[in-house]
Amino acid sequence: MAEGLPYVGLTEQDVQDAHARLSRFAPYLAKAFAETAATGGIIESELVAIPAMQKRLEKEYQQPISGQLLLKKDSHLPISSSIKARGGIYEVLAHAEKLALEAGLLTLDDDYSKLLSPEFKQFFSQYSIAVGSTGNLGLSIGIMSARIGFKVTVHMSADARAWKKAKLRSHGVTVVEYEQDYGVAVEEGRKAAQSDPNCFFIDDENSRTLFLGYSVAGQRLKAQFAQQGRIVDADNPLFVYLPCGVGGGPGGVAFGLKLAFGDHVHCFFAEPTHSPCMLLGVHTGLHDQISVQDIGIDNLTAADGLAVGRASGFVGRAMVRLLDGFYTLSDQTMYDMLGWLAQEEGIRLEPSALAGMAGPQRVCASVSYQQMHGFSAEQLRNTTHLVWATGGGMVPEEEMNQYLAKGR
């Protein structure tokens, strides 16, 4: 870890600053979004054990999973029900704070709930925000920006689900639709923002701010582990499986986890077989200089949140030394596991959120990986496997039933 951290270009202090900023905004969020009132305006998700799913996976794949299987329910985060509620909302808040501080309307010691007043709404309405997204990032940034008072435009790729676009429009967000994939939506969003000095473009491919918003999850998870009496150390390793699209969400979370747990946490990125952009970029060493389409892969997947053909060069280069591995899985496998999780645990997720669920059996089946790290049978028995569920809490019933029908 000591070797890898300098390459990120961000530090523990940067993550602490992000923590502090979210704490300053907590009184505002608690009033602006009723669903965050119970947690005092802190946007955090549950950590739950899923023993019935663990048994089901063992049965379906005839592969024992040593240790305990947990689920991190970012799928049910308040405000926008996805991991993007971490980074997306954080970057909008950071931008709003910067503008208000520069205008002399706010000091760091103020009660930030004053941002709900009409004068602030008026102030923020002079500014706009733009972002390119396959869905969830747009949802998070759109809902948050509109609530603060920004004019906001979300550039949506062809993969974006109709209900996500409809939800954004219901919040007064402008949605621009493209027939092409994620890369085009981001590029067009960037271009549109350049012509307007008052427009701030949130760059999912390169944003350090988004990355820091996600990284706060590390310390938060450490606190949840402590509350539940779970130990992470050399004898009790932690394996975390993160679905990966362009890389900002999983990259930021993995960075935060490394700061929180050091070398005792092992992070894996999971991608659809048709959109393995990060695996390709890291494996070839070309990062954002290569796309899956360059090698004849179509970037078409039911995992809309992961339908990215070209990875973030920033995340790939920053995180390559801090990750333990990558794997891919088919859409059908995601649908199957989506159904099993609903049956066994009563938890409903969108397809992309299941990408991490294939990880534990891959690690438990890979003797070469275990030997490379010198894991003993004892350590493997004491392992915690954490699947990061990235989205799905807002999926409409009708859409969810279609997903469930596709599982085997």
From Swiss-Prot:
EC number: 4.3.1.18
Cofactor(s) listed: pyridoxal 5'-phosphate
Enzyme class: lyase
Paired cysteines (S-S): none
Highest taxon in the source lineage: Bacteria
Swiss-Prot/TrEMBL catalytic activity: D-serine = pyruvate + NH4(+)
GO biological process: D-serine catabolic process; isoleucine biosynthetic process
Keywords: Lyase, Pyridoxal phosphate
A Pfam family this chain is assigned to: PALP
Xref: Gene3D superfamilies: 3.40.50.1100
Keyword Coiled coil: no
Residue positions where N6-(pyridoxal phosphate)lysine is found in the record: K84
InterPro entries cross-referenced by the UniProt entry: D_Ser_am_lyase, Ser/Thr_Dehydratase, Ser/Thr_deHydtase_PyrdxlP-BS, TrpB-like_PALP, TrpB-like_PALP_sf
Molecular function GO terms recorded: D-serine ammonia-lyase activity; hydro-lyase activity; pyridoxal phosphate binding
Subunit structure: Monomer.
Family: Belongs to the serine/threonine dehydratase family. DsdA subfamily.
Name used for this protein in its record: D-serine dehydratase
Organism listed in the record: Shigella boydii serotype 4 (strain Sb227)
Gene responsible for this protein: dsdA
